[in-house]
């Protein structure tokens, strides 16, 4: 609910501002509204946060691929990372944002398909239909949506709704990585439509991930699968690959997991790379896109951001 409220605010408040000003980078608004220093601080803050965030996500995915798949083939971790970044750089170098839109669509479809198939195969192994799963006593332990016991509770429902709305406004409406695709729509009407449709799709996908998370815990409890340990600390993020690749559910589930994992990693990294290049060129270097020398500079920036 909080996410939906946040996306409606972004669609009806922030998007019109960006379109009326004809912005390429959303941080140009800071220059018009607050001046050069605020513009520079905003764009540099985005640069640092996005480099760290995208790098960390790609690092996590590379670790999972290395530990559960590529180690068996004797492929070094360094080679895995280099090949991943090189592939992302190659297809964003030529196509730009248009390529990102299409590849993100394909990658997101693969990721959602992986989640749906994972839910199906784990349910099938347990012996449940989906209807039996959502009505089971085991699932009831994980499906409490509205916590109303005490306002002091960390997950009290009003805190979750308000927090979700502000998270969406900050992480979507004020983030070049998330907004760049909306800024390529033909007009503000199309951009609003895209944002609102996306918000409802995201709600459905979030529900699927909640279902998958509950199902993973139920399956691991029933089959005596422990949460993997790293440096003697439990790593719940490794439970999914542990079940998908090592629990004996079949090779198809493992392949589905790997495809979904790669799709998620590439979708995040390629979008971040394009938005970083845009922000550096537009906000920091003030490059004129019509000059031939600027094209060379953009290529150098693209390579630097990849590194």
Residue locations for each model-derived region?
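Loop-to-transmembrane helix boundary motifs in multi-pass membrane proteins
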Residues: 36-40, 79-82, 278-307
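Helix-loop junctions at the membrane interface of multi-pass solute transporters
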Residues: 13-20, 27-32, 46, 89-93, ...
């Amino acid at each position: 609910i909080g996410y939906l409220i946040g996306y409606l605010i972004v669609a009806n408040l922030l998007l019109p501002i960006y379109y009326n000003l004809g912005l390429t980078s959303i941080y140009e608004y800071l220059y018009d509204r607050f001046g050069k220093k605020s513009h520079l601080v905003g764009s540099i803050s985005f640069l640092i946060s996005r480099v760290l965030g995208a790098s960390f996500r790609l690092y996590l995915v590379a670790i999972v691929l290395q530990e559960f798949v590529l180690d068996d083939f004797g492929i070094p971790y360094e080679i895995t990372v280099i090949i991943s970044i090189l592939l992302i750089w190659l297809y964003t170098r030529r196509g730009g944002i248009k390529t990102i839109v299409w590849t993100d669509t394909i990658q997101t479809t693969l990721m959602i398909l992986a989640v749906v198939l994972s839910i199906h195969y784990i349910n099938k192994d347990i012996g449940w239909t989906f209807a039996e799963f959502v009505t089971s006593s085991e699932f009831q332990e994980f499906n409490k949506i509205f916590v109303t016991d005490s306002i002091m509770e960390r997950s009290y429902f009003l805190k979750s709704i308000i927090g979700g709305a502000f998270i969406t406004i900050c992480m979507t409406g004020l983030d070049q990585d998330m907004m760049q695709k909306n800024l390529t729509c033909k007009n503000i009407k199309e951009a609003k439509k895209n944002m609102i449709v996306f918000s409802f799709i995201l709600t459905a996908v979030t529900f699927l991930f909640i279902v998958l998370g509950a199902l993973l815990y139920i399956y691991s409890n029933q089959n005596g699968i422990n949460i993997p340990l790293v440096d003697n600390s439990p790593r719940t993020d490794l439970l999914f690959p542990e079940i998908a690749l090592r629990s004996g559910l079949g090779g198809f589930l493992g392949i589905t997991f790997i495809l979904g994992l790669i799709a998620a990693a590439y979708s995040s990294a390629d979008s971040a790379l394009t938005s970083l290049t845009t922000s550096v060129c537009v906000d920091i270097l003030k490059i004129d896109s019509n000059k031939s020398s600027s094209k060379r500079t953009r290529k150098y920036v693209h390579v630097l951001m990849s590194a």
